[in-house]
Amino acid sequence: MEKQSGALTASGTMAVCVKMGIPVAITCGMGGIGDIKGEELCPDLPALQQIPVVLISAGPKDMLDRKATIDWLISHGVKVIGTERNYCTGYVFCGEKVELQGKAENSTETVKPPMLIINEIPEERRIEDREILREAIAEGKRAEKEGRYFHPAANGKIDDCTDGYSSLIQLRGLIANMKVAETL
């Protein structure tokens, strides 16, 4: 039996949620706009616009253009807000500050699709060495050239370089997003 990825994208999770009548989907990292083969515009973005489910995420992955991703969502009618603040700075690494449309309110009246709620991994828990990100992007590009998927290769490199810490903070981020969903 050949090994295959069992990952489910944010858009896939949203599609399952709408079929099951679940109004809020959670993920940790999400896709966006970037130079990843076949994901120049990740399907997560049109899904946020078209699928009637609110998504809670720790934000677009660090190898993507976060500002272009947020701008695309806003320009296509998706409300993008943060849980703790009205901007985001990255996913598992810290980057440039990108303005959002506000902060989440604990009211079901204000939480409705199309909406992305960004609940970032706390900055003090993120990976500080951005050289690891550069190495991960290079590994992902190498995988693309070999006909493999970018994200598993890049994520694996980050995990290897951090002795599993990357996976740990992403798991904690996913759990934190579940807790946010419980308050809605």
Regions flagged by a language model, labelled:
Residues G29-G32, A58-K61, V78, T83-C88, ...:
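Short, ordered loop/turn segments at secondary-structure junctions
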Residues V111-I175:
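A C-terminal functional module that forms or caps the active site or interfaces directly
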